[in-house]
Amino acid sequence: MEQLHKLETMIAGWMKDLPHLPRNFTKWLAENAWWLVIIGVALGVLALMTTLSAMTVGSAVLGALGAPVLGGAFLISSVVSLVGAGISVVVEAMAISPLKTMQKKGWDLLFLSTLVSFAGAVVSSLVSVNIIGVVWAALAAAISFYILLEVKSYFGAKAKLAEKSAE
């Protein structure tokens, strides 16, 4: 967890000069994060099932067309995506209860989920030699980290102080 906090501090340093979201919006996001994550977990489970189906059909089709090497790369890339997304969905599901009570643990789990999702997307894109996929993964991670860092002050022991300073 110590390494996670070091990484959090480093990313926060990169984002410190960016403009902030409106206070009312960040407060709304923080207070409603738990049910937004429930929706994300449900959609994530559907995405996992879709990826599993695509793996089965895609590998069979590519293999039948005489492209076993391409089929193998597709299969490896899909497995990496499936594992990364699966871990991310499980970590997000673990974050729901702490997010509901505005605990820092919930925020930390969302941060970890974003890291896992980013790492899985990058590895999957590199295996399939999809450089644009790496760019999109970096863009999605940057937006996710920005939003997470904007709502961070509402979670944990410092949350009460942040709420008082907003009033």
Show which residues each predicted segment covers.
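Topology signature of small-to-medium multi-pass alpha-helical membrane proteins
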Residues: 1-167
